[in-house]
């Protein structure tokens, strides 16, 4: 059985197939990253995207452009939202963020599951409405 590995054509075919797989995965990762949306967690800028595969590759591509990247997906079997965090910059420790949500990991890669009833948007900072905008809305609504 090992003799087939001595045949260069078998090796060349494997390299050729591997290059197709690599090109495909790079294309998918690029397209997923183009859909990333900016949000904030604890005032830190993040890019978030729905993705169930290639988390490391997506996180590696997104994280240099923000404080850290968030990839999430709904796990149909477990019936829960799974969240993966990736950081590039030294100043960020995503394991601390993950711990706040009951998860864990390492400084540059961590994750957690959202409890039932929680949505991914629940983990992000809420936009602040300035008093001026709030009073303007109130005045418009009363006239």
Task: Explain the meaning of each model-derived region.
Residues 1-36:
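Hydrophobic, aromatic-enriched interface-forming segments
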Residues 26-143:
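Gly/His-enriched, cation/cofactor- and phosphate-binding structural elements
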């Amino acid at each position: 059985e090992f003799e087939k590995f001595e045949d260069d054509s078998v090796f060349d075919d494997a390299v050729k197939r591997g290059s197709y797989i690599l090109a495909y995965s790079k294309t998918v990762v690029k397209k997923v990253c183009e859909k990333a949306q900016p949000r904030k967690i604890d005032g830190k800028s993040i890019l978030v995207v729905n993705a169930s595969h290639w988390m490391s590759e997506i996180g590696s591509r997104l994280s240099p452009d923000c404080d850290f990247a968030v990839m999430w997906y709904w796990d149909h079997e477990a019936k829960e939202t799974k969240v993966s965090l990736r950081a590039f910059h030294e100043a960020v420790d995503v394991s601390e963020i993950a711990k706040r949500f009951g998860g864990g990991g390492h400084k540059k890669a961590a994750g957690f599951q959202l409890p039932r009833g929680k949505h991914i948007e629940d983990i992000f900072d809420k936009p602040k409405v300035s008093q001026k905008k709030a009073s303007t809305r109130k005045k418009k609504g009363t006239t």
